[in-house]
């Protein structure tokens, strides 16, 4: 077996696999790369986790969540409410359903700023103008949204 010290060192050295709750600190931002997949529960958990990180402004870049059936719009809206309750200052969305996330956040707390984009190609060039140095940025959506492109842009900025 392992000693207690070996177990502690192993836990301390843990790095998530792929784009699953991976925290990347750059000169400009703290990026939470959780873009491998998304559903309402995992997104709510990611938003709550972001609230525990020491950082400046909290920004959530959120996209469509797939396979939610007839309740998809309502579940996206509830995710926006969760973002507002988690202390997110800015909600940036991409995709038609994700607009409901922005609507839910603004309805819960009108002080939450929102920006919504139809496509990733529209969002990417606008992103630098929306973010500020020191921001903590959560990036989360269903894998089909290709949000790894956002993570790449943020971590190479």
Feature locations, PLM:
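ATP-dependent carboxylate-amine ligase
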Residues: 1-157
């Amino acid at each position: 077996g392992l000693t207690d010290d070996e177990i502690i060192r192993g836990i301390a050295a843990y790095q998530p696999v792929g784009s699953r709750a991976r925290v990347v600190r750059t000169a400009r931002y703290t990026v939470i790369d959780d873009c491998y997949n998304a559903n309402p529960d995992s997104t709510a958990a990611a938003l709550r986790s972001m609230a525990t990180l020491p950082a400046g402004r909290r920004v959530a870049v959120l996209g469509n969540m797939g396979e939610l059936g007839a309740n998809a719009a309502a579940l996206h809206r509830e995710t926006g409410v969760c973002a507002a309750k988690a202390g997110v200052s800015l909600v940036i969305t991409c995709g038609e359903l994700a607009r409901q996330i922005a609507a839910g956040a603004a309805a819960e707390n009108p002080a939450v700023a929102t920006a919504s984009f139809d496509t990733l190609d529209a969002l990417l060039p606008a992103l630098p103008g929306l973010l500020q140095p020191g921001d903590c940025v959560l990036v989360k959506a269903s894998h089909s949204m290709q949000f790894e492109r956002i993570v790449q842009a943020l971590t190479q900025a």
